[in-house]
Amino acid sequence: MTYAVDTNVIFDILFADPEFGPSSRDFISQFCNTNDSLVACDIVWAEASAACNDKAAFARLMNDFGIAYSPMPDSAAIRAGAIWRLARSTSHNAKVRQRLAIVPDFLIGAHALECADALVTRDRGFMRRWFADLKVVDPSKAKRP
């Protein structure tokens, strides 16, 4: 299976989050020596790389985590745009309805839906609301499926 990894899980480990870091680290480390793979899309890659001081350190970090770069296909970007349009049109928040720039989580969810079998994230509610067909795995709630 291919698991897309959300930024919050990488940050849990990178910043040694006292509440979520251990469960995220344990979950990700279970993928060593398996046929399963971990991937991260462009958005996650950009968000996580911003937390590192240099390109080489970031590359080592992602390699150590066993997470491969998986670029966003145009079909996923278009799907994200359609779901974002729906979210804007159904929102009760005027600021959301007027916002034109897409929220990154829509891109992350659409990428996972099209390029992976599941998304590893702690943002279960959002992903389940907007990506009902996406299998969501919360490392703080479950062991590797």
Regions found by a protein language model. Give the residues of each.
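Active-site neighborhoods of divalent-metal-dependent phosphate/nucleic-acid chemistry enzymes
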Residues: A68-A118, R124
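Conserved beta-strand segments of alpha/beta enzyme cores
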Residues: S37, G66-A68, K135
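Short, well-structured N-terminal submotif of metal-dependent ribonuclease cores
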Residues: M1-A40, S49-N63, R144-P145
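Acidic, PIN/NYN-like endoribonuclease modules and their adjacent C-terminal/linker elements
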Residues: T2, G109-P145
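Short, hinge-like loop/turn segments at secondary-structure boundaries
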Residues: K55-A59, A87-S89, V137-S140
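A generic structural signal for short hydrophobic patches within well-formed alpha-helices
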Residues: I10, W45, A77, F126-M127
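Short beta->alpha linker loops
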Residues: I43, N53, M72-S75
